[in-house]
Amino acid sequence: FMQSIEKHDYVISIISDNYLKSRNCMYEMLEVVKDSNFSQRLLFIVLTNEDAKYYKVAPIQDIGADVYSVSGQAKYSKFWSQMDKELDSEIEEIGNSIYAINQIKEKKIIQKILLDLPDFLEFVRENKGLSLTEHLENGFADMISFMEL
């Protein structure tokens, strides 16, 4: 993923509730945001539940990413904290850390997400990604302007 981003002028990221709860998505995005060369080329579409109307098949669950409120941001911190606790339980159940190597590696990744999550959410909030509905209503003018097209 990182190598493919280097080849592009801009990266448009669609942020949904599931995205913010995906280990792979969060791990990669947190790496991208740390690199100022990449972070200056990132554009966000922050999905709201209203944006589900554009799906061909209605999503089973809410898609909206609650990144603009403190309580919404806390929801994602709690989610990743719970993942961390579940790994602690698995490691404890296994008993010997030699046999829990995969769980320990996963725990390191989850802890990295937990550590970097507040900065990422603040980055998204400061860069005010519009919803898909807002982008469609204004013809993606903000993105076009950002990319100086």
Task: Name each region found by the language model.
Residues 1-11, 33-41, 138-149:
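Conserved N-terminal substructure of TIR/SEFIR domains
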Residues 17-37:
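Conserved TIR/SEFIR loop-to-helix hotspot centered on a Trp-containing motif
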Residues 49-149:
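C-terminal interaction surface of TIR/SEFIR-family domains
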